[in-house]
């Protein structure tokens, strides 16, 4: 009986699907009351934990991202639910689930959180009821044609946190270089990607395409969804997923110095340059670069494992020219093919 109380699957479900993580059976069957019983039980237990600590549980993040297409297509129980509730398709089934769970949370004085999928492509009637129940929705998949997602969410009434993969996914590799570990499905994310994010002009937050080619930011918003409710852009958030993490040194390497730009955009959502005047961007970037360079000295003193970018080099008129990313950096070299050390000759 207890097992039936929390049953979350359809024994006769023949749906065939594959999730982004290559699973074939990782979706709850929301036609079963056991799903709701389980979710409500988890919320109750969380409330008890918070209460034991002398706190009130204010927000529960529901997740809700990347539900694979086809996950309910061949479930007799879902078909029966759709007929009983007058639901037309799987998207309306998900709306039914989100509406019920957020209503339950609201009755307990708890706000919901979720990834962008929970707030996309719903009718105004749904948004009018459900959006006020959310404390935050994270906009994450913002590459290319999906760059308008943060503004679609905000305009629909959802409190939106910019969690853009193109700017704030810390586990993306710094560059394409073989020595830079990390993922690259959403592009590359270095210490400048978070810094040049523009929460209130989000289309200019992507200054380079996947191949590193500079984009025309002055034209990036043409024909795209405008931000009509800026009050619903409530913050920025960095993500560090653990698929590629092997030790804490790697955590530090991914985060430092990327998080300086994230922190700056959290405090100052409107960058200090004018994209119509390229010289102001260059000056602002140089100023940021100098500040980061100073902080690296502090990180080094404290023993953190941070990344220093590769030096640049080119041969011009038979002479090797070398530069560095941050002011004051020294480049050590050898002439015998051995690995340079701190005691090797310094390039001047």
Task: Please state what every model-predicted region is.
Residues 120-133, 138-272, 276-289:
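Conserved alpha/beta catalytic core and glycan-binding cleft of carbohydrate-active enzymes
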Residues 112, 160, 331:
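Hydrophobic anchor at the start of a short beta-strand
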Residues 275-348:
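Short, compositionally stereotyped local motifs that mark structural "simplifiers"
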Residues 1, 31, 63-65, 113-117, ...:
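Generic beta-strand/beta-sheet core signal
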Residues 37-48, 53-132, 136:
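Gly/Pro-rich turn-and-neighbor structural signature
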Residues 2-33, 70-92:
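Aromatic- and acidic-residue-enriched carbohydrate-binding clefts of CAZyme catalytic domains
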Residues 106, 111, 152, 180, ...:
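Domain-scale activation on soluble regions of proteins
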Residues 29-33, 37, 88, 92-96, ...:
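Soluble non-cytosolic domains of exported or imported proteins
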